[in-house]
Design a protein with these regions (language model features):
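Short catalytic/metal-binding and nucleic-acid-binding patches
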Residues: 1-247
Length: 247
């Protein structure tokens, strides 16, 4: 279900993040992703994003496939702290599950079992800052929900997801726009701002907080990553003007 189609020359680099355009299609390309499914998919996407440390720059959820422009940053050289591991786990696990992991870590620490503590950390951090792990977690979580909801079994996605590396700068801006224009090309809307299951639609209509803020941060990063700009939603109004022209 999950594989990297092209490996970046910066993979595991401590200097430069990698941007991927990821695509996956429903098996037989059936049109099964309706409103409820797209809302749930977006929810899982944000959950996995918050856990993994990867960031969604742009996305579009269609009726039988999706596009995600994903930035995969290098793992921090100093590692991920125990507190940060637990905070991120809270994005995908229940409070009870996170508390159990915290107790497991504390017991190992109290016993001076550094090797065991390292294994516990690695069990979770190996799933962070990694394209395949991000996609695996997202697709599996959504498939489980979809199969349970629709009383079905088996795979939902057609073959393996596809991914290609996108350079920062014009290539990243152009790819973000290409993704946001999917519903326009499909004749579903005339204005990409009207399509709520896309990064641009969410950035315009989602407000200044929550996922609306996340969408704005991602598009600011996609448009200005070559200038060293991070995920800064305060620059959205300025970026939105130039991005709208690109659209």
């Amino acid at each position: 279900m999950s594989s990297k189609r092209f490996l970046s020359p910066w993979k595991n680099s401590l200097e430069k993040p990698v941007i991927y355009h990821c695509v996956s299609r429903v098996v037989d390309r059936r049109f099964v992703l309706k409103e409820e499914e797209r809302e749930k998919f977006r929810m899982f996407m944000r959950m996995v994003e918050n856990f993994s440390g990867c960031r969604v720059l742009s996305y579009c959820l269609m009726s039988n496939h999706f596009h995600i422009l994903l930035e995969v940053p290098p793992a921090p050289a100093e590692g991920v702290s125990d507190g940060e591991i637990l905070r991120r786990l809270g994005a995908i696990y229940s409070e009870a599950a996170v508390a159990a992991i915290a107790r497991e870590m504390e017991e190992a620490r109290a016993e001076g079992a550094e090797a065991l503590l390292g294994e516990i950390r690695l069990r979770h951090t190996r799933r962070m800052h990694d394209l395949s792990e991000f996609m695996k977690a997202l697709l599996i979580r959504f498939t489980r929900w979809f199969n349970r909801t629709h009383q079905r079994t088996g795979t939902l996605w057609e073959d393996r997801f596809k991914s290609v590396i996108v350079e920062s700068g014009l290539a990243a801006r152009t790819m973000a726009a290409y993704i946001d224009l999917n519903p326009v090309r499909a004749g579903m809307v005339e204005d990409p701002a009207e399509y709520r299951w896309s990064s641009y639609g969410e950035a315009v209509g989602g407000g200044k907080k929550g996922n609306g803020k996340k969408a704005r941060e991602g598009l600011v990063r996609a448009n200005r990553c070559d200038k060293g700009v991070g995920f800064d939603a305060t620059q959205w109004l300025e970026v939105a003007k130039s991005y709208r022209i690109l659209l």
